[in-house]
From Swiss-Prot:
Pathway this chain belongs to: Carbohydrate degradation; pentose phosphate pathway; D-ribose 5-phosphate from D-ribulose 5-phosphate (non-oxidative stage): step 1/1
Organism: Synechococcus sp. (strain JA-3-3Ab)
Database matches in NCBIfam families: PRK00702.1 (NF001924), rpiA (TIGR00021)
Role of this protein: Catalyzes the reversible conversion of ribose-5-phosphate to ribulose 5-phosphate.
Record field: catalytic activity: aldehydo-D-ribose 5-phosphate = D-ribulose 5-phosphate
Broad class of enzyme this protein falls into: isomerase
Similarity remark: Belongs to the ribose 5-phosphate isomerase family.
Stated name of the protein: Ribose-5-phosphate isomerase A
Amino acid sequence: MASADELKQAAAQAAAQKVQSGMVVGLGTGSTAAFAVGALAQRMQKEGLQFIGVPTSERTAEQARSLGIPLATLEEQPRLDLAIDGADEIEVGSLNLIKGAGGALLREKLVEASAAELIIIADASKKVAHLGTRFPVPVEVVRFGWKTTLARVEALGCQAVLRRTAEGDPYLTDEQHYILDCQFGPIANPAKLAEQLKGTVGVVEHGLFIGMATEAIIAGPEGIETLRQS
């Protein structure tokens, strides 16, 4: 039976085939997205694929540079042909997502909102009937007054905790913000919750990606499954 990493690798390889020479491609962040960056670098070396990557985090930028992928900022390339990224949960049917376990939700959303297509890659464990079933919703907040912001977010119906590093320090995003991991349970109306979170004072961004994914490539024990919005 294939391991989770082998399934992620299979989905990443399938997504990398979508990229054509001349494209500007958003490069996601996280363990699954890292496989896609590696698969694209392989195509550059073996097939002569030429593209420009727009990374969604310093971590992804470092990986891409080490593999020889030419990079640009969102300011330099404000329109992307497609973006490839992972997800923590994928709601079957809507393709609404929870993202942000890798801590890059703000830059991911900025880059991926600028892409004509967003291809999500994942193993089959990430499919859910309702967002919030397994994963918390990451909420990026300013550091000033974060406990007050946490209380405001919890008033929306969740239990929120400050994300910390393995050493016990508050986790800092690339933009030097904190992240609250918010357990809502199954979310009946993700679009409404997204609006409520966005309107909460102190919240910079949240990990609900509503209506953004155009396609999800899911790798499972029986092969590759492609999901589209229904």
